[in-house]
Amino acid sequence: VEGVSQSKIRYNIEIKSQIDGDQIFHPKFNEFVDLVVNDIRSKNIESRVTIQSFDFRVLKYLKNQYPSFKISMLVNENYNFSNIFDDLGFYPDIYSPNFKNLTYEIVKKVQEKKIQVIPWTVNSYDDIAKILELGVDGIISDYPDRVKYLLDEKI
């Protein structure tokens, strides 16, 4: 990708891990993070990488051991927003919830903390339009062309 791109590409890398998968389906979470970070650093792309995960152990370890990395906190639709950052223990760079329960109030509360809001995975035109109206900072979608189309329509 780097060799054929005309501009510097940003990477959003998800570390998929969970407690009951440690050393069965993937390395122990801290070893997993170390492997990913070493690979990123070997390619000299650290400044263009965001690491995301649902596994708060990964995010906490990343924050403590590699504080220069941009961190995205993934949460599913069943997560209680009221104490979410207390559970993590710090404010991530990005709050990335399932879009289904996202509200204008939540977006504004998070952005007041200087955290970007980038929901996932928003695919239908109707859902993309609704989420854009909330004032999010970005959208994760399987159809970026749809997001671009709706953004271009607003201009």
Model-derived features: where do they sit?
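Short loop-to-alpha-helix "cap/lid" segments that border enzyme active sites
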Residues: 2-155
